[in-house]
């Protein structure tokens, strides 16, 4: 078996993906499949931390457009990420692999508070660590959270799992002439306005010299393929 390219990574998953074909909520077969992929990645020898969005339950921006204040809407979204983390943690542990959810919020009855020390400890123990609650502050996306947490815990890369196999010049579902980039710099990603991640996330990755690999999670085993250096995606670095 090929040794993994990265010793420690943060994987960014969208909440919408966990909804499966139903489009809302948590689809258990999808959660189980993601859990299988994460477990397989851990078995390669890579230490795996995961940041999940909450858009399958609530999106703060959308809620705020309907009269709720933006900080309150974003807090609702951050709480939704905790639901996703707990669902995925349960699936991983049911399959026999230890996992641990750490929260940006103080909620002792539900989850331990995120600290760098706790994250390092659980990753070193071989657990898959699920990082919920976003940054704990409104106005920041879970993409930015993924880069922030990766920098904090010394991850070597952020793996951004999407429904397309990389960064394209335009939406490939709408524009048949769209071309996929094999590689971009952080600055090119920001200047190009590519919507796969927000500019704040790219800027923080540039500042902390963190590579981001954008890939499709649609095929089972895609995370492991990226970790072995044989996956198909776009590398944003430099």
Swiss-Prot record:
Catalyzed reactions per annotation:
UMP + ATP = UDP + ADP
Gene Ontology MF terms: ATP binding; UMP kinase activity
Biological process per Gene Ontology, one example term: UDP biosynthetic process
Q: Where is this chain primarily localised?
A: cytoplasm
Activity regulation remarks: Allosterically activated by GTP. Inhibited by UTP.
Functional pathway: Pyrimidine metabolism; CTP biosynthesis via de novo pathway; UDP from UMP (UMPK route): step 1/1
Which keywords has UniProt assigned to this entry? Answer: Allosteric enzyme, ATP-binding, Cytoplasm, Kinase, Nucleotide-binding, Pyrimidine biosynthesis, Transferase
Write down the Gene3D superfamilies for this protein, in alphabetical order: Acetylglutamate kinase-like
Stated EC number for the protein is 2.7.4.22
Which Pfam families does this chain map to? AA_kinase
Q: Name one GO cellular component term.
A: cytosol
Q: Specify where the region named Involved in allosteric activation by GTP lies, as residue ranges.
A: 20-25
Q: What residues bind ATP, as annotated?
A: 12-15, 55, 59, 162-163, 168, 171
SUPFAM superfamilies linked to this entry: Carbamate kinase-like
Q: Which family does it belong to?
A: Belongs to the UMP kinase family.
Oligomer and partners: Homohexamer.
- Record-given protein name: Uridylate kinase
Q: Which organism is it from?
A: Bradyrhizobium diazoefficiens (strain JCM 10833 / BCRC 13528 / IAM 13628 / NBRC 14792 / USDA 110)
């Amino acid at each position: 078996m090929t040794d993994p390219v990265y010793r420690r990574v943060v994987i960014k998953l969208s909440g919408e993906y966990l909804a499966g074909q139903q489009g809302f909520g948590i689809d258990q077969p999808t959660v189980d499949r993601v859990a299988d992929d994460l477990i397989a990645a851990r078995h390669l020898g890579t230490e795996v931390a995961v940041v999940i969005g909450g858009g399958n339950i609530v999106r703060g921006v959308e809620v705020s457009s309907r009269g709720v204040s933006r900080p309150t809407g974003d807090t609702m979204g951050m709480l939704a990420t905790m639901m996703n983390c707990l669902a995925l943690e349960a699936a991983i542990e049911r399959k026999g692999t230890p996992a641990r959810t750490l929260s940006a919020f103080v909620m002792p009855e539900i989850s331990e508070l995120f600290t760098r020390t706790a994250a390092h400890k659980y990753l070193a123990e071989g657990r898959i660590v699920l990082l919920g609650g976003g940054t704990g502050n409104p106005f920041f996306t879970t993409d930015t959270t993924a880069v922030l947490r990766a920098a904090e815990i010394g991850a070597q890369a952020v793996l951004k799992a999407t429904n397309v196999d990389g960064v394209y010049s335009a939406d490939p579902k709408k524009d048949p002439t769209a071309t996929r980039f094999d590689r971009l710099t952080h600055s090119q990603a920001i200047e190009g306005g590519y919507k796969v991640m927000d500019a704040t996330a790219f800027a923080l990755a540039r500042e902390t010299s963190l590579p981001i690999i954008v890939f499709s999670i649609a095929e089972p085993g895609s995370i492991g393929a990226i970790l072995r250096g044989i996956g198909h995606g776009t590398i944003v670095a430099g």
